[in-house]
Amino acid sequence: MRYLPHAGLDRLPDNGLVIEVEAARFEEMVVMALDGLPDELGRMMRNVAVTVEHEPGPPGLLGLYQGVPLTNRTSNYAGALPDRITIYHPAICAICRTPAQVVEQVRRTVIHEVAHHFGIDDARLDELGW
């Protein structure tokens, strides 16, 4: 899970400073972030659905991975529904002040959630600066 970096922030700010990005443009940013992944990683994500949620999600959540990380799968893992990565459009825009910041935060959030698919937990991501 990727949470807002502001300690204690449990809801989106209502200060009129939230940048607005059209849904289609935001989705393009997510696609660009995914396209920026190395080809080898992309091939290992064939059974992962990446979606954008345009309504506010759980408080403070930028992205969410739901599924069984590759490191936890056994030989019995088969026939499962795709894992899912959700990127929360309103939450990301709420912490950004410029379009460039939105692009960078989308990229960081996508990489963060993809890392969970590969079995990297939040503690290790924090150690790595993600």
PLM ranges: what are they?
Residues 1-105, 117, 123-126:
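Active-site rim/adjacent substrate-binding subdomains
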Residues 105-113:
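Short alpha-helical catalytic segment bearing the HExxH-like zincin motif
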